[in-house]
């Protein structure tokens, strides 16, 4: 096997007396912007591939190359010199070449293209090409030219004769003619098997430059040709040429920048050696050959570095300057990304205002990817302290634009801009004003988590730079920082939920996990915190505990992460939970005692123990704190009547008693507490029966009912046997001031007891005992009687009665028969009157409410929450099968009028109905539209041009997507809808008087669903329409316009042609309608005639 070819210049005729291309002079022709002021806004965009200015015309450039041979330049040391190559936009000077018969053969670029497309053996392919260049350099050059065209997707052939005799402009024109239309999806943008071509092409170009940097890189026949060809291709009107050539030119420039850096470092090393040799020569008057060799080596290195810089400058002005505003966004991205790379690796040369201005101008680009690359290019520059003075003018010029990009509509750009602002603040602390950083503070509460985290990192850099790692004891250095954090939350007044602030800082700021310091601030009175400050600090503490224990971000900030947490994340979660447990167990009882009179603070504090590792209470030292916690909870039960607080305490009791490790320590305490509450309720009812209940006793009775109701939602209260007492309360309690509270809480407790009884029956065995079923059925009927009477009479507590009825319909639905035959007697099928009362309640209390505008903001929010709960409760009945899909019509007919308030519920209901039955959903939608149409006819008559009729048509249009995009899957649902529509349109038609059917205009509404039909199903609908028309209309020659419009919508034409408007409609008659049942659609041959939907 032959050895890998070395990088040596081919043995050919010397060209030492021939001048090489002077890139400096060439670039000067294009450097029209150099004389303009720095950062002047660019002139009109050249993205539309306009012609260059006259001073860079291809003919002039070609002429400048044609006379290069007339100049004689002294040869330079150490390498052969080639002839100057012409411009891609003009002629080139004829090169002195050694022609051989072998060089006339056609080139074969398959090896290079295959290597780039596959990404395999790229280095070997480059080495073999270098070997061919050393043997037959003209063929190798043509092969490389062919490669650049082939990688663009062009199938044209470049021969050595073309490469040697034609100008680059002519070669590009010929390749443009050979570029086929089907090659538009060129490799650089192709997906699939070619998705890695971009990375492979970058690797190929980098390898080529590195393997030739010793000598061949400075051969004019090689590099000058590449530069001119790529420059011409980058100016082509063919997008594939322009895109690929720009990519290659920019990657070549990046590789040349790396070579320049290497040469510069070599020169500095040689200079140090020269200084060392100079010191030796002071004591030796004789010559020093090593010194002279070093000087000669430095001179050669300087010359080579200068030549490379000239090529870089020429490529920049001939390609970058024209392509950074190209019409193709990815071309602009390539230019900016590579410019950022040059600035990063070679700031001494590129971090100048003449280059930075292109970054600044591109920050105004309309495409987010381009703006994002501008920001990414700037971030590493501000981390280099030696060049900060060069960035000062740029920052002052474009600071306002950077601040505005904080709110960029492209999220990735906004995130990168926040990171840039953080780095910018680090190096220029006085640059950003308060007005500039306020948008960053607002982003801490953004719904996008990466953006909020980036804003949190900025806040850390600006405020919390000196935070210390928290421990189990308070940290004195963190006390002022915790105060600053709380003050920031209060003064920001941007959001009322601290959980978003905590989440933004959770991973980057240790302050949010310094629970010991927070507790010290709250307990110790020497810090003199005001009440609002304490409330906000407790909220921050609670949110931090919840996220540390669960690892879950707040609602709306879900982490898009696949798979289970890593081992480190799981370990950190366990360690954080253990630390917060040991830190807060002694503090929580003291905090509850201190703030026992403040509802808002106590609710947050009571939630904290839910996230403890309860096994920690088993130690003797911690059991004391558990008893303190129980005593504190008892005091809260005695002091407070707030429903939310009572539920929080009851939940904590339930959480503690259901944990097997400590339940024995807590169960007795809980039983004692509830025994006292139940005993007082019995005593109060006895007073009520004896008519001895005064106002004070009445208030106490209501308070104990509320306390017991809070516990009823979390635990089974059958031990206290309150069923009969609560029934009596609901039936007989009539005191006006407290009747509503008492009746609602009592109904709630009765229902929850039914739930626990039902669950207990299913747990006790496979076949429930008959007496247990009878007892449960008796209780169920008792509760049903009470709540249905309440709903029917609209008595006090009607809202709770509505909720209980809906839940009872689900709890005792038909699914019980599937669980066990013995449970069939428990199934409840409400009669029509009950269902009608549910609809009436919904209309009166939700859809017909008109006084919302008169309420204040908080009251309006509470009322709307309650209304949404009622609508969702009705939707649950359909979703869980307690009512048929057809009953959804009562909600769907409000789809358009109440979409703003209940749209999400309506959409979810439609989706679930479709999952239950496509056909029933189609019929339900048709019934909904029929109901609205009938109401329209009763109110004002049917006018198809009226606003009311158009609103029904718009509703039909909005309900169309409910069927999904799979027409084959929902074909029978759509067909059923059309059948119902046709039947309704010709309903009650009297053929004697030939009057237009009163419902005929309903066909115009059904037109909105014609586009959902398959072609063969349209024929079935047409046949059914003709049959109904013939049977009911008879031989009448009258053809009504709605009929004609509907028939036209069923003809075989594009869906876009099915117009909903009445004007301008050309209807195809039945005789001329084309049959398409046997036509083929899509690719390939037909697979036989599809089964047409049943002819109804």
From Swiss-Prot:
Q: Which residues form the SCD domain?
A: 320-405
Q: Where is this region: Disordered?
A: 1-53, 67-106, 1057-1096
Q: Which GO terms describe its biological process?
A: cell division; double-strand break repair involved in meiotic recombination; establishment of mitotic sister chromatid cohesion; meiotic sister chromatid cohesion; mitotic sister chromatid segregation; regulation of DNA damage checkpoint; sister chromatid cohesion
Locate the coiled-coil region(s) and give their ranges.
261-312
Q: Quote the biased-composition stretches of kind Polar residues, using this chain's numbering.
A: 1-21, 1060-1073
Q: Which domain of life is it from?
A: Eukaryota
Task: Report the GO molecular function annotations.
Answer: chromatin binding; DNA binding
User: Which keywords fit this entry according to its UniProt record?
Assistant: Cell cycle, Cell division, Chromosome, Coiled coil, Mitosis, Nucleus
What do mutants without this gene show? Answer: RNAi-mediated knockdown results in embryonic lethality. RNAi-mediated knockdown from early in larval development results in sterile, uncoordinated (Unc), and protruding vulva phenotypes, in abnormal embryonic cell nuclei morphology and in defects in the mitotic and meiotic cells of gonads. RNAi-mediated knockdown results in somatic gonad cell division defects with a reduced number of pi uterine cells at the early- to mid-L4 larval stage. RNAi-mediated knockdown results in chromosome segregation defects in early embryos with lagging chromosomes at the anaphase phase of mitosis.
Where it mainly occurs, coarsely classed, is nucleus
- Which residue positions does the secretion signal occupy? none
| GO cellular component terms, A-Z | chromatin; cohesin complex; condensed chromosome; MIS12/MIND type complex; nucleus
Q: Where in the cell is it found?
A: Nucleus; Chromosome
Tissue specificity is:
Expressed in gonadal cells.
Instruction: Please report a single Pfam family linked to this protein.
Output: SCD
Q: What does this protein do?
A: Component of the cohesin complex, a complex required for the cohesion of sister chromatids after DNA replication. The cohesin complex apparently forms a large proteinaceous ring within which sister chromatids can be trapped. At anaphase, the scc-1 subunit of the complex is cleaved and dissociates from chromatin, allowing sister chromatids to segregate. The cohesin complex may also play a role in spindle pole assembly during mitosis. Plays an essential role in cell division during embryonic development.
Q: List, alphabetically, the PANTHER family matched.
A: LD34181P-RELATED (PTHR11199:SF0), STROMAL ANTIGEN (PTHR11199)
- Complex and partners: Component of the cohesin complex, composed of the smc-1 and smc-3 heterodimer attached via their hinge domain, scc-1 which links them, and scc-3. Interacts with scc-1, smc-1 and tim-1.
Family indicated by similarity: Belongs to the SCC3 family.
Question: Would you tell me the protein name for this molecule?
Answer: Cohesin subunit scc-3
Native source species: Caenorhabditis elegans
Name of encoding gene: scc-3
């Amino acid at each position: 096997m032959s050895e890998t070819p070395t990088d040596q210049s081919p043995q050919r005729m010397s060209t030492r007396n021939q001048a090489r291309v002077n890139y400096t002079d060439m670039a000067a022709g294009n450097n029209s912007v150099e004389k303009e002021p720095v950062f002047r806004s660019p002139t009109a965009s050249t993205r539309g591939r306009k012609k260059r200015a006259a001073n860079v015309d291809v003919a002039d450039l070609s002429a400048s190359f044609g006379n290069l041979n007339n100049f004689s330049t002294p040869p330079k040391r150490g390498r052969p010199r080639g002839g100057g190559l012409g411009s891609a936009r003009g002629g080139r000077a004829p090169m002195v070449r050694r022609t051989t018969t072998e060089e006339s053969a056609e080139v074969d670029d398959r090896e290079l293209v295959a290597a780039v497309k596959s990404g395999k053996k790229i280095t070997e392919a480059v080495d073999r090409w270098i070997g061919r260049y050393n043997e037959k350099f003209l063929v190798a050059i043509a092969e490389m030219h062919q490669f650049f065209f082939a990688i663009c997707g062009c199938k044209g052939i470049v021969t050595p004769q073309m490469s040697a005799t034609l100008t680059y402009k002519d070669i590009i024109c010929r390749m443009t003619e050979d570029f086929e239309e089907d090659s538009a999806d060129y490799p650089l943008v192709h997906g699939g098997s070619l998705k890695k071509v971009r990375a492979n092409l970058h690797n190929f170009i980098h390898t080529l430059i590195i393997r030739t940097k010793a000598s061949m890189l400075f051969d004019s026949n090689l590099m000058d040709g590449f530069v001119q060809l790529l420059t011409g291709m980058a100016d082509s009107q063919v997008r594939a040429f322009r895109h690929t050539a720009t990519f290659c030119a920019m990657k070549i420039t990046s590789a040349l920048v790396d070579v320049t850096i290497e040469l510069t470092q070599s020169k500095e090393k040689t200079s140090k050696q020269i200084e060392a040799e100079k010191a030796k020569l002071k004591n030796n008057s004789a010559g020093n050959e090593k010194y002279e060799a070093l000087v000669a080596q430095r001179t050669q290195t300087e010359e080579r570095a200068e030549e490379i810089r000239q090529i870089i400058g020429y490529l920049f002005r001939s390609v970058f300057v024209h392509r950074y505003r190209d019409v193709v966004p990815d071309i602009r991205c390539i230019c900016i990304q590579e410019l950022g790379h040059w600035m990063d690796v070679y700031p001494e040369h590129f971090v100048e205002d003449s280059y930075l201005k292109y970054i600044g101008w591109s920050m105004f680009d309309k495409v987010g990817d381009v703006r994002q690359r501008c920001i990414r290019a700037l971030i590493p520059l501000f981390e280099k302290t030696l060049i900060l003075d060069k960035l000062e003018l740029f920052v002052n010029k474009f600071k306002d634009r950077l601040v505005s990009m904080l709110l960029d509509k492209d999220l990735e750009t906004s995130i990168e801009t926040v990171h840039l602002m953080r780095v910018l603040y680090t190096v220029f602390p006085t640059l950003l004003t308060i007005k500039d950083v306020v948008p960053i503070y607002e982003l801490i509460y953004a719904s996008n988590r990466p953006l909020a985290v980036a804003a949190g990192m900025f806040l850390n850099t600006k405020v919390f730079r000196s935070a210390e790692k928290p421990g189990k004891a308070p940290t004195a250095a963190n006390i002022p920082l915790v105060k600053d954090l709380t003050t920031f939350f209060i003064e920001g007044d941007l959001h009322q939920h601290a959980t978003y602030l905590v989440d933004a800082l959770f991973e980057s700021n240790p302050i949010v996990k310094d629970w010991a310091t927070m507790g010290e601030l709250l307990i110790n009175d020497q810090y003199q915190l005001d009440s609002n400050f304490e409330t906000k600090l407790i909220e921050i503490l609670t949110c931090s505990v919840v996220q540390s224990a669960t690892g879950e971000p707040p609602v709306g900030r879900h982490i898009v992460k696949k798979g289970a947490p890593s081992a480190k994340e799981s370990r950190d979660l366990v360690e954080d939970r253990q630390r917060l447990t040991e830190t807060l167990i002694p503090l929580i009882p003291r905090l509850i005692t201190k703030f026992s009179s403040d509802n808002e603070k106590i609710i947050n504090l009571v939630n904290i123990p839910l996230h403890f590792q309860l096994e920690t209470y088993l130690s003797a030292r911690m059991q004391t704190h558990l008893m303190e916690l129980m005593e504190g909870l008892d005091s809260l039960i005695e002091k407070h009547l707030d429903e939310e607080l009572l539920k929080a305490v009851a939940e904590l009791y339930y959480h503690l008693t259901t944990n097997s490790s400590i339940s024995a320590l807590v169960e007795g305490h809980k039983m004692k507490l509830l025994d006292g509450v139940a005993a007082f309720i019995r005593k109060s009812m006895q007073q009520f029966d004896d008519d001895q209940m005064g106002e004070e006793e009445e208030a106490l009775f209501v308070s104990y009912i509320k306390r017991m109701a809070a516990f009823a939602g979390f635990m089974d209260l059958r031990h206290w046997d309150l069923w009969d007492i609560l029934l009596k309360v609901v039936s007989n309690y009539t005191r006006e001031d407290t009747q509503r509270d008492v009746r609602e809480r009592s109904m709630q407790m009765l229902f929850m007891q039914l739930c626990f009884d039902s669950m207990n029956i299913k747990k006790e065995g496979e076949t429930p005992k008959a007496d247990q079923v009878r007892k449960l059925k008796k209780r169920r009927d008792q509760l049903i009687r009470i709540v249905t009477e309440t709903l029917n009479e609209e008595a006090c507590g009607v809202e709770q009665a509505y909720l209980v009825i809906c839940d009872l319909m689900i709890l005792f639905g038909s699914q019980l028969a599937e669980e066990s035959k013995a449970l069939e007697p428990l199934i409840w099928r409400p009669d029509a009157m009950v269902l009608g009362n549910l609809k009436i309640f919904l209309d009166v209390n939700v859809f017909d409410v008109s006084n919302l505008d008169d309420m204040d903001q908080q009251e309006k929010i509470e009322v709307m929450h309650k209304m949404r709960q009622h609508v969702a409760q009705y939707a649950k009945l359909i979703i869980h099968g307690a009512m048929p899909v057809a009953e959804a019509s009562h909600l769907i007919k409000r789809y358009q009028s109440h979409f703003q308030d209940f749209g999400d519920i309506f959409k979810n209901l439609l989706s679930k109905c479709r999952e239950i039955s496509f056909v029933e959903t189609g019929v339900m939608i048709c019934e909904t539209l029929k109901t609205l149409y009938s109401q329209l006819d009763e109110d004002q008559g049917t006018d198809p041009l009226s606003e009311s009729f158009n609103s029904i048509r718009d509703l039909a249009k909005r309900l169309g997507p409910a069927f999904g995009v799979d027409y084959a899957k929902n074909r029978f649902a759509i067909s059923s809808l059309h059948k119902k529509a046709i039947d309704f349109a010709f309903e009650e038609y009297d053929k004697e008087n030939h009057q237009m059917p009163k419902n005929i205009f309903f066909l115009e509404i059904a037109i909105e669903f014609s586009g959902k039909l398959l072609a063969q199903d349209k024929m079935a609908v047409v046949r059914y329409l003709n049959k109904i028309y013939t049977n009911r209309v008879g031989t009448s020659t009258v053809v009504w316009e709605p009929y004609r419009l509907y028939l036209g919508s069923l003809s075989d034409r594009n869906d876009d042609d099915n117009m909903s408007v009445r004007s301008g409609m050309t209807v195809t008659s039945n005789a001329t309608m084309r049959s398409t049942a046997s036509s083929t659609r899509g690719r390939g041959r037909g697979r036989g005639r599809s089964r047409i939907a049943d002819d109804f």
